[in-house]
Amino acid sequence: MNKENMPEIKIGVVAVSRDCFPESLSVNRRKALMDAYTKKYGKDHIYECPICIVESEIHMVQALEDVKAAGCDALVVYLGNFGPEIAETLLAKHFDGPKMFIAAAEESGSAASDCTRLYQQYLRV
């Protein structure tokens, strides 16, 4: 592929989570995404933000500052569980560049069972 006319960009990936789930669920899903991407395309144009936003504007500001400091030109908001909430949409609003939201597919096996059980406890079903 001729890449002469393609811009060089750096994509920042920020995971988000709901507070009714363990943060590690989104973090582990983000790591799996990053592993799959870097295995196929390398590490040159992608950055894994170490801050996971857990329904907090404080986390959002920290993540925004982190991806800016890392020199990211584009943003991927990785929904580790459930859809966008206030903090994630504010992150997209305040990031000056292209951005997109992507969502994790639900795993099978024990991880999916754990998620269902935790969410039922959260809802007190």
Model-derived features: where do they sit?
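Metallocofactor- and cofactor-centric catalytic cores in central/energy metabolism, strongly enriched
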Residues: 1-125
